[in-house]
């Protein structure tokens, strides 16, 4: 169990969130003006409904809080804020943190060990993050701690535990499961060939279906060019679930950039 510190900094309500500055990160640059406006509206509600709690000397400010809220709401931009029900606090450490972890082996023996975690989430309870990895989530690299933990929360809306199959129509479950496992096997094949550190997709995706869904959700929003062409069938399922197409956003943004360059000549 994690013992929460008695002294923690909580972000207070702020009428003047710096949304323009908060949006100025690579992860969000391809959103249309309309999408940005709707994302801000969701983020404002998020900050009204959730407490951001800074731990172990970490200090929150309005810009940090606004960016955290925007990234939390990106996956539910088309789903609605109610998809983030089930937790009321976001606990933020300054760096990856140590927790006591218990696990049961194949013969039923329970083991305990201390492990370093970047983030944690449960069906009911807070989401725990760390600022170092949150900062690394601003870019478009395929890594995004916040989206990873949000994906677990969305996954757990479909049952007591994360399974890799979010709340989708029953008729789509078998196809989703088939395509997700095919992606896991493909990622594992690459790991076997080149090693974990050289794999083009985070090797954590091959560990189990829940982690595959969470990791690929990171790529879905922050590196669609690595996800969409490699797993096109699964990509379409993610587009249907999230009701977004980041790959299309990327293409439109690139085309507008090319047009702008031509206009300058």
From Swiss-Prot:
Entry keyword annotation includes Protease: yes
CDD domains tied to this protein: Peptidase_M90_mtfA
Any single Pfam family the record assigns to this protein: Peptidase_M90
Major subcellular site: cytoplasm
The protein's enzyme class: hydrolase
GO terms for biological process, alphabetical: proteolysis
Cellular localization per UniProt: Cytoplasm
Binding locations of Zn(2+): 111, 148, 152, 211
Record key words, sorted: Aminopeptidase, Cytoplasm, Hydrolase, Metal-binding, Metalloprotease, Protease, Zinc
GO molecular function, one term: zinc ion binding
Quaternary structure note: Interacts with Mlc.
PANTHER family recorded: MTFA PEPTIDASE, PROTEIN MTFA
Entry function: Involved in the modulation of the activity of the glucose-phosphotransferase system (glucose-PTS). Interacts with the transcriptional repressor Mlc, preventing its interaction with DNA and leading to the modulation of expression of genes regulated by Mlc, including ptsG, which encodes the PTS system glucose-specific EIICB component. Shows zinc-dependent metallopeptidase activity.
Family as reported in the entry's similarity comment: Belongs to the MtfA family.
Protein name as it appears in the record: Mlc titration factor A
Source organism of the structure: Salmonella typhimurium (strain LT2 / SGSC1412 / ATCC 700720)
Gene it is expressed from: mtfA
């Amino acid at each position: 169990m994690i013992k929460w510190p008695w002294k923690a900094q909580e972000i207070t309500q702020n009428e003047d969130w710096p949304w323009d500055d908060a949006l100025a990160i690579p992860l969000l640059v391809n959103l249309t003006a309309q999408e940005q406006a709707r994302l801000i509206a969701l983020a404002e509600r998020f900050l009204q409904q959730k407490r951001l709690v800074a731990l172990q000397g970490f200090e929150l400010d309005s810009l940090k809080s606004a960016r955290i809220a925007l990234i939390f709401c990106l996956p539910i931009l088309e789903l609605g804020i109610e998809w983030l029900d089930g937790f009321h606090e976001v606990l933020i450490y300054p760096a990856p943190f140590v927790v006591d972890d218990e696990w049961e082996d194949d013969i039923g023996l329970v083991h305990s060990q201390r492990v370093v975690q970047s983030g944690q989430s449960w069906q009911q309870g807070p989401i725990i993050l760390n600022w170092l990895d949150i900062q690394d989530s601003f870019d478009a690299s395929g890594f995004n701690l916040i989206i990873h933990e949000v994906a677990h929360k969305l996954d757990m809306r479909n049952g007591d535990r994360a399974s890799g199959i979010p709340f989708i129509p029953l008729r789509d479950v078998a196809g989703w499961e088939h395509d997700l496992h095919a992606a896991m096997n493909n990622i594992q094949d690459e790991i076997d060939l080149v090693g974990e550190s050289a794999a083009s997709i985070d090797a954590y995706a091959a560990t189990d279906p829940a982690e595959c869904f969470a990791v690929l959700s990171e790529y879905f929003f922050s590196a669609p060019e690595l996800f969409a062409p490699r797993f096109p069938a699964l990509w379409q399922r993610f587009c249907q679930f999230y009701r977004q197409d980041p790959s299309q956003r990327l293409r439109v943004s690139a085309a507008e950039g090319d047009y702008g360059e031509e206009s300058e000549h």
